[in-house]
Amino acid sequence: MDNCIVCKSKCLDIFLKVDDLTYWKCKFCEAKFLDKKNYISYNEEKKHYLKHNNSLSDQGYRDFLQCLIKPLKDKISNNDFGLDYGCGYAPALTDIFKKDGFNIDVYDPFFFPNQNIFLKKFKFIACSEVVEHLFKPYEEFIKIDNLMDLNAWFGVMTSFMTEDFLFKNWHYRRDPTHVVFYKKKTFKVIASQRRWKVLFPSKNIALFNKIDLS
């Protein structure tokens, strides 16, 4: 690996080798990520997502999504146009926002690959359990930045890393589609590389605000 896939720093070391997998660490942004040679194929990844039991009628899953929805709704108004980025095959987050009166679009590279969304601007973008799957997070965050209107909010929910020594036995690492892992420091670096402020309103939640510097 030549560069960190999150921040493009060259300050990399091998972090861990386990179960025939190699993980790298960035000494600048503190992200940990899987070596590219260990990525599963597109078809394997899609098959794995189809096993998720994230139906629109699953109340437990809908309650879980409120962990992101509630702090994000505190920052936006009902007439704001939003995007569920990486919505999966059953966009429950979109369904909740729509039932609350919001106008929201969907995008998912596997299930809703509508490229027209990249011609639009949004006042809020929600990514629930998405960023840990990104093979090219630096480039994806550029895409998201381009989708954000001025003063827009971008909400992320993912399991934050804690202590490095816990990583080997962390259940979150064992999902074959989870390839990149973040700390608060990582999200602060992501924000600093763009016109974003970042807040951490609750556990495993990051809210980014695209500020107007004009």
Residue spans for each PLM region:
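Feature marks short, surface-exposed loop/turn motifs that line or immediately flank catalytic pockets
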Residues: P113, T162-D164
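Conserved N-terminal segment of class I S-adenosyl-L-methionine
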Residues: M1-F124, S128, F141-I142, M157, ...
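A short His-aromatic
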Residues: E129, H133
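Alpha-helical subdomain
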Residues: F165-N169, R173-K185
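Conserved beta-strand signature within the Rossmann-like core of class I S-adenosyl-L-methionine
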Residues: N151-F160
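Helix-to-beta-strand junctions that scaffold the AdoMet/dcAdoMet cofactor pocket
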Residues: L134-F135, M148-L150
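Short glycine-/acidic-enriched loop or helix-start segments at secondary-structure transitions
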Residues: L93-T94, K136-P137, F165-F167
